[in-house]
């Protein structure tokens, strides 16, 4: 793991010692080189933990998420160039340092083998994210969004710390591998039920589960482009990863406790999809779309079958790339029209035909059209939920219909129609932007050729 962690840490001195003209080139190039390192972890002999040390290791569940995290840093740096064009060099370097430190803490969270280490890095991701949202957001409401983000995350994760201390006192170890191998069957008592809630609540807030999701649209809407991309693509996946790791240890209690949360996530999936149809703010629509997709992941994880876990991992990777792509496209609109209101950016297809092509592909990926990897993830979850209970087919099928509706609504509102009067001097799409969209879309399409590498434990 150190061969990934140390080069990422070395990006910090590189950023601060780079010349004014070379900041973007140096950081983008080196982070792109670093993003190839997780490819080494894919070639593992078997499904056991591939340990390089006692503290950090990777396995088939961790590796796809590490790859996603590493791949996203150069993309966020590329996307932020226009946003920071008027900032002095010291501020640019500080912004990049925040992104790099966030990447370091994410890599360490995904690869930590000790649960207390996992908890520390899980909380550490909060600091750079909060700084990015509250310092570099566009509107004054960003402070309110930062408060929501901090409050929800901290309140959700304090019970997790108490549960971890309790487990350590009882069992004497918090090593994930040891706990998985030596876990006792937990009986269905009040104390154990509360412990299960304490363990999973932090991750349900992070996913977020419907009802605990109010911080997400606020944070997404107020965050700068890099904040939105990292938040949608990787930070939400921390919740899914934590749930997959810990619900296995807490079995068979998970099977008893899962029912209310399964019902809530299935209900929330339809509710948030329906909310998307009524949105006027483009970033808010994409944020609610994220909640809807992650509700499907919660459902898959709580069903607790190998196939559902596979579907959850594939869906997390697919959603990470798709939602990040949609935020990039929304940002390219915002940089030209200076508004997030969809109706004010209508008719852009006539001015930016290539950007309209990326919008079409992103919308189709969002509604899980073949040959994207999204389809495979949704089908796996759909089949699993159907085998768990036949009635879920009605809910998931209805959700897929609404997803198709709001994806097409988003595309038609922003691209079709007559141009508004305030758009008089529109800059053409830059090579940087087109490269950015291509780098998001190519993994979505290429992974469908060999989805084996991101199917998690069950490959």
UniProtKB/Swiss-Prot annotation:
GO terms for cellular component: mitochondrial inner membrane; respiratory chain complex I. It is found in: Mitochondrion inner membrane. The keyword Electron transport applies. Its EC number is 7.1.1.2. It is a multi-pass membrane protein. It comes from the Eukaryota. It is an enzyme of class 7 (translocase). InterPro entries: NADH4_N (IPR000260), NADH_Q_OxRdtase_chainM/4 (IPR010227), NADH_UbQ_OxRdtase (IPR003918), ND/Mrp_TM (IPR001750). Disulfide bonds: none annotated. The keyword Protein biosynthesis does not apply. Keywords: Electron transport, Membrane, Mitochondrion, Mitochondrion inner membrane, NAD, Respiratory chain, Translocase, Transmembrane, Transmembrane helix, Transport, Ubiquinone. Pfam families: Oxidored_q5_N, Proton_antipo_M. GO terms for molecular function: NADH dehydrogenase (ubiquinone) activity; ubiquinone binding. Core subunit of the mitochondrial membrane respiratory chain NADH dehydrogenase (Complex I) which catalyzes electron transfer from NADH through the respiratory chain, using ubiquinone as an electron acceptor. Essential for the catalytic activity and assembly of complex I. This is NADH-ubiquinone oxidoreductase chain 4. The gene is MT-ND4.
């Amino acid at each position: 793991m150190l061969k990934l962690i140390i080069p990422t840490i070395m990006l910090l001195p590189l950023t601060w010692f780079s010349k004014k003209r070379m900041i973007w080139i140096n950081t983008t190039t080196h982070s792109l080189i670093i993003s190839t390192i997780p490819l080494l972890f894919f070639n593992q002999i078997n499904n056991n933990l591939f340990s390089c040390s006692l503290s950090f290791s990777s396995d088939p569940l961790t590796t796809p998420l590490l790859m996603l995290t590493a791949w996203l840093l150069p993309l966020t740096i590329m996307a932020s160039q226009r946003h920071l064009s008027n900032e002095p060099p010291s501020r640019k370097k500080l912004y990049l340092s925040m992104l790099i430190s966030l990447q370091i803490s994410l890599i360490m969270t995904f690869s930590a083998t000790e649960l207390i280490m996992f908890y520390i890095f899980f909380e550490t991701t909060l600091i750079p994210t909060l700084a990015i949202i509250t310092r570099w957001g566009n509107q004054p409401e960003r402070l309110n969004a930062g408060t929501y983000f901090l409050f929800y995350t901290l309140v959700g994760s304090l019970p997790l710390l108490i549960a971890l201390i309790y487990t350590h006192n009882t069992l004497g170890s918090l090593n994930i591998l040891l706990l998985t191998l030596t876990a006792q069957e937990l009986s269905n008592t009040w104390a154990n039920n509360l412990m299960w809630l304490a363990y999973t609540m932090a991750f349900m807030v992070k996913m977020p589960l419907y009802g605990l999701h109010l911080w997400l649209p606020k944070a997404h809407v107020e965050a700068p482009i890099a904040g939105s991309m990292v938040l949608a693509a990787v930070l939400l996946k921390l919740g899914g990863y934590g749930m997959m790791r810990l619900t296995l240890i807490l079995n068979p209690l998970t099977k008893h406790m899962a029912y209310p949360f399964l019902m809530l996530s299935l209900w929330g999936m339809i509710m948030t999809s329906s909310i998307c149809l009524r949105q006027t703010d483009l970033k808010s629509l994409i944020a609610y779309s994220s909640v809807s997709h992650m509700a499907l992941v919660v459902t898959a994880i709580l069903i607790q079958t190998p196939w559902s876990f596979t579907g959850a991992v594939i869906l997390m990777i697919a959603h990470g790339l798709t939602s990040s792509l949609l935020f990039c496209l929304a940002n390219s609109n915002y940089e030209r029209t200076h508004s997030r209101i969809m109706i004010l950016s209508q008719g852009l297809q006539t001015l930016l035909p290539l950007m309209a092509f990326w919008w079409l592909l992103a919308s189709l990926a969002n509604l899980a059209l073949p040959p994207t990897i999204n389809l495979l993830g949704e089908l796996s979850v759909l089949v699993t939920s159907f085998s768990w209970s036949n009635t879920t087919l009605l809910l998931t099928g209805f959700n897929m219909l609404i997803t198709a509706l709001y994806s097409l609504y988003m595309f038609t509102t922003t691209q079709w129609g007559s141009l508004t009067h305030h758009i008089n001097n529109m800059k053409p799409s830059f090579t940087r932007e087109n490269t950015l969209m291509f780098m998001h879309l190519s993994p979505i399409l290429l992974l469908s050729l060999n989805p084996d590498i991101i199917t998690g434990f069950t490959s």
